[in-house]
Amino acid sequence: MPKMKTKSSAKKRFRVRPGGTVKRGQAFKRHILTKKTTKNKRHLRGAVAVHETNMVSVAAMLPGRGI
């Protein structure tokens, strides 16, 4: 049986942490930033963990990654 393919889009968007959790980037930070406050943009920096309700979908897109 052939290997399962990883979704290319998911490979670029998610990183698996050593503990098995998955980190992702924040949304709403690409464009239309002039109307957003500095505080709002600052809070959108950095990465956050994928919520547990979405982990099944993310794990299906990233087979063989230990999720």
UniProtKB/Swiss-Prot annotation:
Q: Where is this region: Disordered?
A: 1-23
- Bias (Basic residues): 1-16
Keywords, ordered alphabetically: Ribonucleoprotein, Ribosomal protein
User: Is Ribonucleoprotein one of the keywords?
Assistant: yes
GO MF annotations in UniProt: structural constituent of ribosome
What residue stretch is flagged as signal peptide?
none
Q: Which SUPFAM superfamilies did the record assign?
A: L35p-like (SSF143034)
Query: What Pfam families does its record include?
Result: Ribosomal_L35p (PF01632)
Q: Name one GO biological process term.
A: translation
Q: Name one GO cellular component term.
A: cytosolic large ribosomal subunit
Query: Which PANTHER family does the record associate with it?
Result: 54S RIBOSOMAL PROTEIN BL35M (PTHR33343), LARGE RIBOSOMAL SUBUNIT PROTEIN BL35M (PTHR33343:SF1)
**Name used for this protein in its record:** Large ribosomal subunit protein bL35
Q: Source organism lineage? A: Bacteria, Pseudomonadati, Pseudomonadota, Betaproteobacteria, Burkholderiales
